[in-house]
Amino acid sequence: MTGASRRSARGRIKSSSLSPGSDEGSAYPPSIRRGKGKELVSIGAFKTNLKILVGLIILGIIVIYFVINRLVRHGLLFDESQKPRVITPFPAPKVMDLSMFQGEHKESLYWGTYRPHVYFGVRARTPLSLVAGLMWLGVKDEMYVMRHFCENSDDLSTFGWREHNGRDYGRQELVENDMVIETSFVKSKGDGLGYGGDWAVRIDVKNKGLNDDVKRSAHLFFYLADEGGNVLNLGQDGLDFQGSSLLVSGSREDVGDWQIHLKSQNQLETHYSGFKTPHIYNLSDLVQQNLALQARKFGRLQLSDTSEDSSNIYIFQISGRLPFTIDIPFISGIKGESSNVEKRLTSLTGLPLSDLLKKKHQEFDAKFNECFKLSEKHDSETLGVGRTAIANMLGGIGYFYGQSKIYVPKSTQPGSRDNFLLYWPAELYTAVPSRPFFPRGFLWDEGFHQLLIWRWDIRITLDIVGHWLDLLNIDGWIPREQILGAEALSKVPEEFVVQYPSNGNPPTLFLVIRDLIDAIRMEKFVASEKDEVLSFLERASVRLDAWFQWFNTSQKGKEIGSYFWHGRDNTTTQELNPKTLSSGLDDYPRASHPSEDERHVDLRCWMYLAADCMHSITELLGKEDKLSKENYNSTVKLLSNFNLLNQMHYDSDYGAYFDFGNHTEKVKLIWKEVIQENGQLSRQLVRKTFGKPKLKLVPHLGYVSFFPFMSRIIPPDSPILEKQLDLISNRSILWSDYGLVSLAKTSSMYMKRNTEHDAPYWRGPIWMNMNYMILSSLYHYSIVDGPYREKSKAIYTELRSNLIRNVVRNYYETGYIWEQYDQVKGTGKGTRLFTGWSALTLLIMSEDYPIF
């Protein structure tokens, strides 16, 4: 229900009116109304009150029953001995309770641009935060439209962070039609400030072209909302930019008394509206309804300049002719005159703010050059894309709080209509794949994200990985997609919210942890960083062990050393090839008929990586548990056994590695008339099998086939390595001028739709994460001794050049880094601003690869 309808409902709660000329006491004789006959009145009142009391008791019992029933269904009213295992936290000290994540570190990261789903937003790393954000009126098809949440459908020419250091500074550009909005965020710390310090936002709005003769106007909406429901106090009804600049003030336990100001040297018109609501995910609806009401009443496109009692949200409309600039400083920890409010305001507005932003810009450039050392290798355009990649990766980091929904069969919850339990309330600090489309945490993406982030800021990486590991349940399982909080839930269809505890996801966090271990061995860290990584591993090792054991037991296959991704649907008639969502490769073709006989070569290699990583941790930490160390060592030996790998997955005719399972190539989607539940006749695409499946290698060459190559299990002198190099470089199979395609052009599933509505996803398009991993192994084989060293180097050099050139070209043609790239033309596809693993382009530029 929208805010306007909530207010209307509240307005309808009035005392019952009486009919004209009626008197409330007219049912009684005058003598009784004057106080005579008190006994009659008392008895009548007693009977009435008794009925009401009984009714209230019955109603209360009913309410309590339903509340308790719901709490039990959602796992909120179990004692620890009765709580279902799936929603029971892992019984070990939390990683995030380490001292390294407290004190100055925690405070330094308290405030940030941790709302990746909106075009610009600020919040604190606390469940019920003070939240700030920006909206504006855009124009589409000659109509005003509200811009707030990042949406692909908004079709902005470009948007994203141009600079961001992940801690206290960021500069973003948003371009819509002929208008450019630049948002800058910077933090200030010092003695006497509130927890987390002060911060400021600068918003520059200008014409895209140099022609200032076209004086168009812009309407911005800057808002403050307190998720905890704390009352906000309006500074003044009308803003005088030359005088008082106070927008709104308030008080919170975390930061004390605070104020938000707005200052500008331009002629601007301002209006406001205040709301009282527990929800902030529908703020744009509140604004649009308020504007629409004002337009109908007065013909003006402006907020109402009114506020509800005890408002916890204030929205300020700032309108003016382009160009204009506004500065919005946040001052906290105010304690009387000693707080130097005016001095702090001066330091975060006007020229002092310009100087601070310039300093942060210079620091960003210096750190970028120090971390990636690209200046002598690439032209300015390529360097620009590299800066955009790291800036958007860091600027896309978000903070979320809520409870995941975990699937449980209804049969385990008698009388329940729900098929889920609620995970425990948890917070998550994480990078996200894409602000417009995937603005939340994804487990298998995060390992790739951290390969880039740790090279910029190791402490941010440890903080993020620690948050993920603290989501581990008692069985060693982590939900693969984190949809936490009302704002996140509002962006995801209900059918995709529930997480399945039998399903895994590639354990890519081992990828970055292994990288950190190798960095220690290669002495890439200063002493303090090394100590923190070791402390982190000491605390995290028990959780990593439990995570590994969950995979090693729940995803194991029938044969020793075999594994398969659980969760494939063996009953579906709607899919050409049942998806394997848990693998992260969704529609990549596997065995046509899912069964427990399957062996998935990619999961086998992930398990090799995980076991090798755990073995390295036990060695690095000098663990005394020899049994655990030997178990990991034996698992590493088993999974790196080249002969066993070949027996299970190698096809000597193709010279390639494949999955194994119950498979036939004779399947296709055909149109069939189907009677719906409502009796209507419709046509649907359904799968038809024309041949009996049998157990065999699944002949679909693609990314999955190269996991043994990516894992570097293949000896550098093996002829099988040459086979892999030939397959990679064959233009008729995987090679393109833009990168390696995800599925061989010779595959029967190449670019085939999986359902009527599912376009090919991992069946041809070029993906940067897999190209990065293959490229890293090409680099490896090009520097180790072996007969295929030069061949590896030649392929590596050309593939690297193709990948960089295509990403850079697309960025300057479209304004974005993309989720995937077309297998024929190289054009960007999928969601835009996909600066999750597509940002690995920067590591390709710097030739910085993990030791898989």
Swiss-Prot record:
- List GO BP terms, alphabetically: epidermal cell differentiation; oligosaccharide metabolic process; protein N-linked glycosylation; root epidermal cell differentiation
Tissue expression, per UniProt? Answer: Constitutively expressed in roots, stems, leaves, flowers and siliques.
The UniProt record lists the EC number as 3.2.1.106
Q: Which residues lie on this side of the membrane: Lumenal?
A: 73-852
What is reported when this gene is inactivated? Embryonic lethal. Impaired glucosidase activity leading to a strongly reduced cellulose content. Abnormal shrunken seeds with embryos arrested at the heart stage. Low levels of storage proteins in seeds accompanied by a loss of protein bodies, abnormal cell enlargement and occasional cell wall disruptions.
Molecular function via GO: alpha-1,4-glucosidase activity; Glc3Man9GlcNAc2 oligosaccharide glucosidase activity
Superkingdom, taxonomy of origin: Eukaryota
Question: What's this protein's name?
Answer: Mannosyl-oligosaccharide glucosidase GCS1
What is the native source organism of this protein? Arabidopsis thaliana
Q: Which gene encodes it?
A: GCS1
